[in-house]
Amino acid sequence: MSKTTASRAPRFAGKVVIVTGAAQGIGRGVAESIAAEGGTVFAVDRSPIVHEVVDAITAAGGEAAAHEADLETFAGAQGAVDQALKLFKRVDVLVNNVGGTIWTKPYDQYGEAEIEKEIRRSLFPTLWCCRAVLPFMVKKKKGVIVNVSSIATRSIHRVPYAAAKGGVNALTASIAMEQTGNGI
């Protein structure tokens, strides 16, 4: 360990962080890293595997809780935020990581239901979680929201996914501008 690393406090010490899509991949890595940096992790996913992630974090000495939810609905997002607030009394950081390409094919081969499913999976969880956590962050005039997007916003054979992640980029910029006076 370098002197710099050893001499500084963990970056997330004393912070409560909601991580969505925390059962695997990037979300799991983010949850584990935040816990290793002293953060309290509220890991959310629709997969029950999220409990295994939390078990691993707590076994390593971290503080974490798991919550299963369908974040494609506002009710699911609001329920997750409400549960985090009930358990930890606050949310300092929200990391939105839900999403992923379902199909890869030329755009003209997508059916209406497939397009809607891609948008629902890769845009709505971020949209709803931001909406659910904002009232709390606005009230305390402080908070951090990290929205994970993708370079695939400019790719072929994933047009609905690209559109959804482009929407995440627009949502991120708009919320940042709208909430700048609120410390978010």
Model-identified regions with their sequence ranges:
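Canonical Rossmann dinucleotide-binding motif of NAD(H)/NADP(H)-dependent dehydrogenases/reductases
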Residues: 9-42
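A glycine-rich helix->loop->beta "capping" turn
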Residues: 60-63, 83-94, 102-103
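Conserved mid-core segment of classical short-chain dehydrogenase/reductases
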Residues: 86, 101-116, 139, 157-160
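Catalytic Tyr-X3-Lys loop
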Residues: 92, 108-127, 142, 146, ...
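Alpha-helical segment proximal to the catalytic Tyr-Lys
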Residues: 135, 177-181
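Residue(s) in the substrate-gating loop at a strand-loop-helix junction
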Residues: 150
